[in-house]
Amino acid sequence: SWIDRFTISSNPTPTDPIAFKLALIDKGDNIIYLARPCQYIWSDTCNQDLWTTSQYSKVVLETYEEVLTELSTRYTEIHIVGYSGGAGIAMYLGTTNNPKIKSIRTVAGNINHNELSKIIKISPLRKSINFYPLEKKANKIPQIHYYGNKDKVIPNELQQRFYLRNKENSCIKIKQAKASHNKGWLNFWINNYNIKVDCS
């Protein structure tokens, strides 16, 4: 989405699709990969707002919710994994009261864009919804949030603060990996993708 901290990409399609590679590692029966808006497929409705200030807007999030509703008619259980910005989508879907969602895993994830903006001192995503009120709505879903000890894009302070706000909740866990934002996750995922996530 961004070439660097100050330059917006004209095409949000990742040059190194880590989330897709993580999905390929998973040996589950039915793995479905959802890209972000305007990745891989371009349309006349695509504009830079969709991968910058509006990336967590109501229209974007409701589109994913529609997909989730459709998938819920096909499968008895849904386990959501979100990488980087996709983690915010995963967290939002956890607030939709969909009974099919059994766990949430995030990897190097922007789990609260409002908090991240404060931590790294960037302009907030003004056209995106506020994530703070949503956190409690997903707190009964087993979650584990993986962060990289060398991640300079999404500092582990984000996960640490989230955990402190929810430290009394046994459903929410965080775990450190030896990784940066885009390096080290594939090897980590090979040994961790199938770890059970529960509220014990």
How would you label these PLM feature ranges?
Residues 46-73:
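Alpha/beta-hydrolase active-site loop
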Residues 164-200:
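C-terminal catalytic histidine-bearing segment of alpha/beta-hydrolase fold enzymes
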Residues 92-96:
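Active-site signature of alpha/beta-hydrolase-fold catalytic machinery across serine-
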Residues 1-35, 40-42:
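Short, surface-exposed "cap/lid" segments of acyl-processing enzymes
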Residues 109, 114-178:
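The feature captures the conserved acid-bearing segment of alpha/beta-hydrolase catalytic domains
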